[in-house]
Amino acid sequence: MHAERSPVVIGVGQVLANRDRTVAAAREPLRLIADAVHAAAADACGTGTRLLRDVDAITVPHVASWAYADLPALLAERLAASPARTFSAPVGGQWPAALVDAAAARIAAGESRIELVAGGEASASLGVLQRAGVDPGTDLGWTAEPGGPAPIGADDLGSPAMQAAGMVLPTRVYPMVDTAFGHSVGETPAEIMASGAAVFAALSEVAATNPIAWNPAARDPAEILRVGPDNRMICEPYPLAVNAFPLVDQAAALLLTSRAVALEHGVPEERLVHVWGGAGAADAADVLARPALSGSPALCSVLDRALASAGLAAEAVDVVDVYSCFPVVPRLASRYLGLPTKALAGATGGHSSFGGPLSTYTLHSLAACAERIRSGAGTALVHANGGYLTRQHAVVLGREAHVDGYIGDPEPHDTAEPGPAPCPLAEVPEEPVRVEAATVEYDRDGHPAQGFLVARTADGRRLAGCTAEGDAASARELTVFPEGPAHPAGEAVVGREVRVRPVGGRIQVDPA
């Protein structure tokens, strides 16, 4: 590839808004995103008006806090641009990395000249307005095409088997995966929690220095582990402090082009951040159809391929920014890459401390890593995750162009393999089953509310189910906190044998 077609990031813009959560400061996502775009253009070359008019592709991650019939078209209208290519991505945290990687591939191939990737959320403002009885559309004039929070499709919740088992929320599924992963590497529940707390403490230190962070305060692991009214247990073993915090108003934008076009628009050479390329992969969308719940072949695949194509060893990368909606994601990456979790804290600050603007988060990571490279870092690896640890994408950025030009592989590889045959609840055997993954969800008063279980029968079939709400006896069989979550964790549940009985579409769990 000719060096002049090397894809580069030329402008980054980030917006933090309404952290005080007032009605007066509430703005819809479109306005926040447009502000981020103008900031990116100014970052590239002053006002950037001509640059924005010349944009020929606009792609956006999914926006959940407000629905738009055609967000790229609305942005194009505001920018006086006439893009030949537009795309609004479905739900998925991997999309910012995938969109930037695809944009870089098109630029390198000469298929486009200037691409814009932008997104954002206004979930904090939407909550403020709802509590105040203010209608964003009729009272504040937010866009009404169609308007309102974006609907969640049934497919976004999980497979029918997952839905029947109550595995329809990330707050339930990710801790279940972590219990399986921890057991597979010989960790006790206390060690799983301590590892997660260390990850999120390191992330909070980064957030404390990030002016776009929603919660910019450094926290130590002991504080993160301490369960109480301000840090209640959500789903074992995750207290609130290690859960993503989506109620934020944040937006980000990246402008990409070739080196030649960048110089044509007057962007200084030292401001260019080269997109070396990336890799995408996907595991089975149905968590219960995966061969094992203790890992992610897709995560390993994208890290392997992105680094191998770039000719980099993990320990040689200057900035490694791994997705951090829940501790299990950086824990898995740390184990696979052979790096300490602190080395994966990156440049953003994590979904709890920086804020978790849903599908847009990694756009902030890419912007923050681009700034790190401009400040002297040589390379950055940005990882993104979507679904229930399902879809993965990683991108490598560099201060200099890669010797081979763009080396990415933006089309995701399918890593799905057939898992164990399911065991319908109606056929649950009377003999004990072995726990593969489990969690207990707590109510807002700090009491165990419901248990969730994945287990294997003696012949290897997998069963999944949830207990009835208020079934304290079953919750006791699945909890790692026999004395309550304010006390130290006890023995692991994963690997233990229990008896399961179907009761009205739910399960009752008894000792083996």
Question: Which residues does each PLM region occupy?
Answer:
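Oxidoreductase and adenylate-handling cofactor-binding alpha/beta cores
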Residues: 367-374
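Active-site capping/gating segments
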Residues: 387
